Regions:
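Accessory nucleic-acid engagement/destabilization modules that flank
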Residues: 1-133
Length: 133
């Protein structure tokens, strides 16, 4: 198993523990749970590793990286991906608000509505009800 595949397995488990229903793009159901995490979600510039939907609305993205990778540099990639979300998924004319980078061992998070948004380490993914607007 490649290191990134191992990280994705751990991230799937972390998302599930936080109350997310982790689903594949080919057979997802946004109504199956308050929070749905879709793997390999298409965006204008490629694919986001995870798209996080709460109540059917796209609220966040998460990028998966192999264990041992420094996540601080990945924040720029996640930011770029958040800027290439198709407009039909924008909420109130705004782009995705919550961004994560994770190795499955270490997870960073930022809220783009913070006055000075910056990534910070968190111990777990937020629960869907916490991210509900």
């Amino acid at each position: 198993m490649r290191p990134e595949e191992s990280a994705r397995e751990k991230i799937d488990e972390l998302l599930s523990l936080a109350g997310w229903s982790v689903q594949d793009l080919e057979r997802f159901n946004l109504k199956s749970s308050l929070g749905v995490a879709i793997r390999e979600f298409p965006i204008e510039s490629g694919y986001a590793d995870y798209a996080l939907f709460v109540d059917g609305k796209l609220v966040g993205l998460s990028e998966a990286k192999p264990e041992g990778m420094t996540l601080s540099g990945v924040a720029e990639q996640t930011e770029r991906y958040s800027s290439s979300i198709p407009e039909k998924f924008h909420i109130k004319g705004e782009n995705v608000r919550f961004l994560y980078e994770s190795t499955g061992v270490e997870t960073f998070f930022r809220d783009k509505k913070d006055p000075s948004p910056r990534s910070r380490r968190v111990f777990a993914f937020h629960r869907p009800e916490t991210l509900k607007e």
